[in-house]
Amino acid sequence: MSRVAKAPVSIPAGVEVTLNEQTLTVKGAKGSLTRVINNAVNVVIEDGVIKFLPVEGAVGAWAQAGTTRALVNNMVVGVSQGFERKLKLVGVGYRAKLVGSDIDLTLGFSHPLVHKLPAGVTAECPSQTDIVLRGVDKQLIGQVAAEIRGYRPPEPYKGKGVRYDDEEVRRKEAKKK
């Protein structure tokens, strides 16, 4: 039984939540998000909170209710506060710059990499070695950050590569003679 599903999601001021059959829409100051709710979960909106209850007899209903609660909570936080993910470029000559809605990356390859940002994600480069991604959809921000990191993941010997701001790269010792 999921304990996550038992905690209701509170709706902050300025956020509007509507439920149309199995489609939940959350609108706020930063934007709006829509999600289709699993059939094994009943959603109840009352008194400024959203409650998640499993459907009787459905297999894995408590697990689905907990997952749905976590996803809806991320939607509410996203439209009210937004999410951001920071990336650092570590290495000689590694640079990033913003060109329109694209990020131009120089990561030690023979050619520059151009990463197109999807709709709903904005980027900022406070310095040549820092990238800040912002948006309302937590999953989309994480996906874009993982794609950019995937071009040159941090390697364990010198630590060069693209890493998350809070990432600790496990270093290895060089081979002994």
From Swiss-Prot:
Gene3D superfamilies: Ribosomal protein L6, alpha-beta domain. It comes from the Bacteria. One of its GO terms (molecular function) is structural constituent of ribosome. Part of the 50S ribosomal subunit. This protein binds to the 23S rRNA, and is important in its secondary structure. It is located near the subunit interface in the base of the L7/L12 stalk, and near the tRNA binding site of the peptidyltransferase center. Residues 152-177 are annotated as: Disordered. Residues 152-171 have a biased composition (Basic and acidic residues). This is Large ribosomal subunit protein uL6. Belongs to the universal ribosomal protein uL6 family. Pfam families: Ribosomal_L6. GO terms for biological process: cytoplasmic translation. Keywords: Ribonucleoprotein, Ribosomal protein, RNA-binding, rRNA-binding. HAMAP family: Ribosomal_uL6_B. GO terms for cellular component: cytosolic large ribosomal subunit. The keyword Transmembrane does not apply.
